[in-house]
Amino acid sequence: MSTTLGTKLKLTIFGESHGVAIGGVIDGILPGIKLDMDYIEAVMKRRMPGQNDMSTPRKEADKAEMLSGVFNGITTGAPIAFEIRNSNQHSSDYEKTKNLMRPGHADYTGYMKYKGYSDYRGGGHFSGRLTAVLTFAGAIASYILEGANIFITAHVLSIGEVIDENLNSMTGSAQLRDKLKQMELPVISEEKEIFMRNLIQDAKSNHDSIGGVVECAVTGVPAGIGNPFFDSVESRLSHMLFSIPAVKGIEFGDGFEMSKARASMVNDQMSIIDGEVTHKSNHNGGILGGITNAMPIIFKTAIKPTPSIAMSQNTVDINNSSDAIIEIKGRHDPCIVPRVVPVIESVAAFVILDMMLDESPEYIKSRWSL
């Protein structure tokens, strides 16, 4: 089982949805950084369940306890170990259906991989519950990046067929960034927000769920970060983004739309402005040859509908190898997309900080006076 990721900055995760706790170990955080716990807890709160009618009613405090690596609020350079206690499990919801493989979940694949020994309650180690660990680690990374004037902004680009405005030229707007972080459904267009909420409520009332797309922008990363081929910026980001259980697709810049265009339309032409190389457009999403060009890194992430729905579905009983019908009980999200937004921001922050510490550590150190 692969539970560690990173190069200079490493994250190891542990735990299961209905176990005692989930948590992680972050190795590689620079010493001497005074952490702002209010900042970190605000990021965690945006992911937290049970806050509105678009989310599961399961309530978890998502309060992380740091066990090492921070002393008097300042990083020591030692690994930061932390845990988040699970406090609101309804494990009995899963007893009657433990032999039924839930469609859209990792029940069957996990059963085959781990010979039936994996914890089936709430998805166990496969659960989106573990994104709380990714979010906490990424919130620390995001705080450090912001101290170096690198900012990450994400929003819900679409729910179903309803599409919000793109970030585009607004990516560097502190006002927009702050606004989105305060919203239950972080979208740019207030009109589209109404339609999205209606779609989510319609799915909920029909015992169904709905997916969408999250758009994310990273600004302030200097040119020259990344590598060609196997360690491209796209590869590194995608590797960790796909650790989010609901993610099923990623595109950078104009992505698949570029396949319909001509080069004259999507080549990001350049000029010198105030002595600096500037791109006149950003169709490639701030990355060329796997390396940053100082334009905003733009990517979109496809989020599938929450697979736990109360409708009757065909499945199999793995114990007696027979067909079966399952109706999933429990507390589930009619749309997970809004809660995924801070997770994607956090994952992006962790990867970007890892790359910066690997290739340009002085850039971070100098801005923190380390």
UniProtKB/Swiss-Prot annotation:
Annotated GO molecular function terms are: chorismate synthase activity; FMN binding
SUPFAM superfamilies per UniProt: Chorismate synthase, AroC (SSF103263)
- Which pathway, per its entry? Metabolic intermediate biosynthesis; chorismate biosynthesis; chorismate from D-erythrose 4-phosphate and phosphoenolpyruvate: step 7/7
| Gene Ontology process terms (BP) | amino acid biosynthetic process; aromatic amino acid family biosynthetic process; chorismate biosynthetic process
Positions of FMN binding: 125-127, 289, 304-308, 331
Question: Which range is the signal sequence, renumbered to this chain?
Answer: none
Q: Cofactors per UniProt?
A: FMNH2
Per the record, its GO cellular-component terms are:
cytosol
Annotated residues that bind NADP(+) are located at 47
Pfam families recorded = Chorismate_synt (PF01264)
Per UniProt, subunit arrangement is:
Homotetramer.
Q: Which HAMAP family match?
A: Chorismate_synth
Function (record text): This reaction introduces a second double bond into the aromatic ring system.
**What family does this belong to?**
Belongs to the chorismate synthase family.
Q: What is this protein called?
A: Chorismate synthase
What is the originating organism of this protein?
Answer: Acetoanaerobium sticklandii (strain ATCC 12662 / DSM 519 / JCM 1433 / CCUG 9281 / NCIMB 10654 / HF) (Clostridium sticklandii)
